[in-house]
């Protein structure tokens, strides 16, 4: 797991573009059948990527949870949001024995205290790409799947300004 430290604000003011990229940019999040994780000391956030192709992958694969977080399992005191950003793919997430199918741009929130989380792809020819962000949690909420079709769609901008994005709130 890559660990990123916060930078000194005085030093940051004089960073070059290259230095900013080195400090902030996360690359290489998707490797077949691996979990890639980047821990940031800023807000104690963990950004993760997983692209299961030929096997089912556990959320803590390659992460020493005890050494990095002082917990027995990854979500003991953390919560996580998971998006499938693999186009034309269906991803399967199993959280404590409950199976969730995520289509492209679907989101799954998993609450703290969930012991086992695994990832798989329905079709290895079109693997799911799970983009995840985990944060410390202090209470439990209901684990919930939110399909892209059920997300709040909020059109922004205008055709006249050639800027007409849509904000999707899960």
Please provide the spans of the model-predicted regions:
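Basic/polar N-terminal segments that are highly enriched at the extreme N-terminus
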Residues: 1-4
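Intrinsically disordered, low-complexity, positively charged segments
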Residues: 7-66
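Glycine- and acidic-residue-biased ligand/ion/polar-headgroup-sensing regions
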Residues: 43, 50-55, 72-96
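Double-stranded beta-helix
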Residues: 124-164
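Conserved small/polar residues in nucleotide/adenosyl-binding loops
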Residues: 169-170
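Short hydrophobic-aromatic micro-motifs
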Residues: 46-47, 83, 108-110, 130-133
């Amino acid at each position: 797991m890559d660990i990123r430290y916060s930078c000194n604000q005085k030093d940051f003011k004089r960073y070059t573009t290259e230095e900013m990229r080195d400090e902030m940019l996360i690359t290489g999040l998707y490797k077949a059948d691996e979990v890639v994780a980047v821990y940031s000391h800023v807000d104690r956030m963990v950004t993760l990527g997983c692209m299961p192709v030929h096997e089912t992958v556990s959320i803590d694969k390659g992460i020493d949870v005890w050494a990095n977080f002082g917990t027995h399992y990854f979500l003991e005191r953390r919560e996580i949001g998971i998006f499938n950003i693999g186009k034309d793919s269906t991803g399967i997430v199993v959280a404590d024995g409950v199976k969730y199918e995520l289509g492209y741009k679907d989101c799954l929130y998993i609450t703290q205290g969930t012991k086992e989380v695994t990832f798989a792809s329905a079709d290895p020819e079109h693997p799911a790409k799970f983009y995840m962000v985990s944060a410390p949690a202090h209470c439990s909420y209901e684990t919930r799947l939110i399909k892209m079709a059920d997300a709040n769609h909020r059109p922004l901008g205008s055709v006249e300004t050639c800027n007409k994005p849509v904000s999707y709130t899960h």
